[in-house]
Amino acid sequence: FSMCEHHLLPFIGKAHVAYIPNGKVLGLSKVARIVDMYARRLQIQENLSRQIAEAVEQVTGALGVAVVIEAQHMCMVMRG
């Protein structure tokens, strides 16, 4: 989960990360670490996706990176 910077409420979900390697390949645990590192910060879902993609691209030199985050935002769930 991560915390919304606007409402200070959590959003909970899954991150799907895919990339086209350019020589260097990350293990699954490294991808999970990158996601966890950025998810611990106050932010919005769009920034989280961008930060994960940029980090994977920087570390691997990937030809392309895709990040999709499916999340439930507690600010929306609590409103009904």
Swiss-Prot record:
Gene3D superfamilies: 3.30.1130.10
Activity regulation summary: GTP shows a positive allosteric effect, and tetrahydrobiopterin inhibits the enzyme activity.
Molecular-function GO term, any one: GTP binding
InterPro entries per UniProt: GTP-CH-I_C/QueF, GTP_CycHdrlase_I, GTP_CycHdrlase_I_CS, GTP_CycHdrlase_I_dom
Record's catalysed reaction(s): GTP + H2O = 7,8-dihydroneopterin 3'-triphosphate + formate + H(+)
PROSITE patterns, A to Z: GTP_CYCLOHYDROL_1_2 (PS00860)
EC top class, as a word: hydrolase
Protein name: GTP cyclohydrolase 1
Annotated organism of origin: Mucuna pruriens var. utilis (Velvet bean)
